[in-house]
Amino acid sequence: SNISNSNLGLSFINKLRPVTYTRNNDESGKTEYGVIAQEVEEVLKSEGVENTGMLTVTDEGMYELRYNDLIAPMIKAIQELKAENDALKDKLTQFEEMQSVLAGEIEKLKDNRIKAVNSQINSPENQ
């Protein structure tokens, strides 16, 4: 219940800082990829979002981040980028059409100028 559209999208995703790290208790030293939960908390606050299940703090003060909760903002960010891309494609099409019209006008002007010069050269006054 209480379903509404997410307000977290591209702005939120752009503020996140992807990092690589190794866990303190991992003797294998494997590199992991993620984000810093404390930084996510600050970004959420900057986006006006609090009281979310995305982040929890354990009794020991350890931050836990539910990475699955990042999927919806990433989907919204992709949708926002798609809309922006579509708008840019439309604008590009308009510019290409305008360029084509202008190129045609330039050709007409060149042809008219050539005809005018040829007319002056071939006029009886110049012979």
Predicted regions and their residues:
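Residues that recognize and position ribonucleotide moieties
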Residues: Y33-G34, Y63
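Active-site-adjacent substrate-recognition loops and nearby beta-strands
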Residues: S1-S6, T20-Y33
